[in-house]
From Swiss-Prot:
<feature type="binding site">
    <location>
        <begin position="12"/>
        <end position="13"/>
    </location>
    <ligand>
        <name>NAD(+)</name>
    </ligand>
</feature>
<feature type="active site" description="Nucleophile">
    <location>
        <position position="151"/>
    </location>
</feature>
<dbReference type="GO" id="GO:0006096">
    <property type="term" value="P:glycolytic process"/>
</dbReference>
<keyword id="KW-0324">Glycolysis</keyword>
<feature type="binding site">
    <location>
        <position position="315"/>
    </location>
    <ligand>
        <name>NAD(+)</name>
    </ligand>
</feature>
<keyword id="KW-0963">Cytoplasm</keyword>
<dbReference type="InterPro" id="IPR020829">
    <property type="entry name" value="GlycerAld_3-P_DH_cat"/>
</dbReference>
<comment type="pathway">
    <text>Carbohydrate degradation; glycolysis; pyruvate from D-glyceraldehyde 3-phosphate: step 1/5.</text>
</comment>
<keyword id="KW-0560">Oxidoreductase</keyword>
<comment type="subunit">
    <text>Homotetramer.</text>
</comment>
<comment type="similarity">
    <text>Belongs to the glyceraldehyde-3-phosphate dehydrogenase family.</text>
</comment>
<dbReference type="GO" id="GO:0006006">
    <property type="term" value="P:glucose metabolic process"/>
</dbReference>
<feature type="binding site">
    <location>
        <position position="181"/>
    </location>
    <ligand>
        <name>D-glyceraldehyde 3-phosphate</name>
    </ligand>
</feature>
<dbReference type="GO" id="GO:0051287">
    <property type="term" value="F:NAD binding"/>
</dbReference>
<feature type="binding site">
    <location>
        <begin position="150"/>
        <end position="152"/>
    </location>
    <ligand>
        <name>D-glyceraldehyde 3-phosphate</name>
    </ligand>
</feature>
<dbReference type="InterPro" id="IPR036291">
    <property type="entry name" value="NAD(P)-bd_dom_sf"/>
</dbReference>
<protein>
    <recommendedName>
        <fullName>Glyceraldehyde-3-phosphate dehydrogenase</fullName>
        <ecNumber>1.2.1.12</ecNumber>
    </recommendedName>
</protein>
Length: 337
């Protein structure tokens, strides 16, 4: 079964989701909406990418859309999501990737245009969040608007799940060492709510807030209130790393932690988590499709209850692949499979 999908917002995640969809046999992008981009520019932005290289297929444009590998993709320029005629393209599922319509009420506007489900590619204040490999099996077909959480939550949640399932996670603090993103500044500029966030991204290590750790409690209820964290924005363009320092209920050695991660990555979290004992650096993970790459040689243990775990993630490519995987999964549930 091929699921027909629309994308609202052809920014960083919208374009990387599109590229991932081309590689996914169960998902076909049939429409894109972005009021700020014309079709010829959309084709250029899809074809060339400074981080992920040239698009491997064929991209052309016409007045009303893109032709990608011989398949036509309708292109709209509506500002109001309610006015996007998703139904005329057959797009049953819509990816909301503008970063603007992240609440259930705002994202529900897509339903007026004929979409059956809306997947928000960002954390949401009120829409149910799903992380593949962690809580996707709790999805029910009556949910119309859902969130794929954040890239950091998608890395941290599988990591925390393995610790909690095997050894009990009492409490933990997370730091994500995160590549800069489009919301940051190329040179110092005004940022009234976050003064540090207004400093030049490529010149500074910038402490920042993140709700990614607390969000784990929403996808793993037993960990609610047990995790919190912060972010350090660093001068790299892509790939980030989670540092989880936590206390376990059961006595455990670091070798036992490694074995649990290795086992999970080969079984229930296969495709979501991977395990590595190589001497990795961030650029080695550019384009990696996993949500969480456990770095077995980077972690340490203070004692048999207090450990530090390190896991990499491509915050663009890996996250975008999960958006597509989530759509394929919920479409299967909706179809009764």
């Amino acid at each position: 079964m091929v699921v027909k999908v629309g994308i609202n917002g052809f920014g960083r995640i919208g374009r990387i989701v599109f590229r991932n969809a081309v590689e996914h046999p169960e998902v076909e992008i049939v429409a894109v909406n972005d009021p700020f981009i014309e079709t010829h520019y959309a084709a250029y932005m899809l074809k060339y990418d400074s981080t992920h290289g040239r698009f491997k297929g064929d991209v052309k444009f016409s007045d009303n859309g893109l032709d990608v590998d011989g398949k036509h993709v309708r292109f709209y320029q509506e500002r109001d999501p309610a006015n996007i005629p998703w139904a005329e393209t057959g797009a049953d599922y819509v990816i909301e990737s503008t970063g603007v319509f992240t609440t259930t009420e705002k994202a529900s506007a897509h339903l007026k245009g004929g979409a059956k489900k809306v997947i928000i590619s960002a954390p949401s204040a009120d829409a149910p969040m799903f992380v593949m490999g962690v809580n996707n099996e709790t999805y029910k077909s009556d949910i119309k608007v859902l969130s794929n959480a954040s890239c950091t939550t998608n890395c941290l949640a599988p990591l925390a799940k393995v610790v909690n399932d095997n050894f009990g996670l009492v409490e933990g603090l997370m730091t994500t060492v995160h590549s800069y993103t489009a919301t940051q500044k190329t040179v110092d500029g005004p940022s009234s709510k976050d003064w540090r966030g207004g400093r030049a991204a490529a010149q500074n290590i910038i402490p920042s807030s993140t709700g990614a750790a607390k969000a784990v409690g929403k996808v793993i209820p037993s960990l609610n209130g047990k995790l919190t964290g912060m972010s350090m924005r660093v001068p790299t363009s892509n790939v980030s790393v989670v540092d989880l320092t936590c206390r376990t209920d059961k006595s455990v050695t670091y070798d036992q932690i490694k074995e649990a991660m290795k086992k999970a990555s080969a079984n229930e979290l296969k495709g979501i988590m991977s395990y590595s004992e190589d001497a990795l650096v961030s650029s080695d993970l550019n384009g990696d499709t996993h949500s969480c790459i456990f770095d077995a040689t980077a972690g340490i243990a203070l004692n048999d209850h207090f450990i530090k775990l390190v896991a990499w993630y491509d915050n663009e490519w890996g996250y975008s692949r999960r958006v597509i995987d989530l759509i394929a999964y919920i479409a299967g549930v909706d179809a009764g499979k």
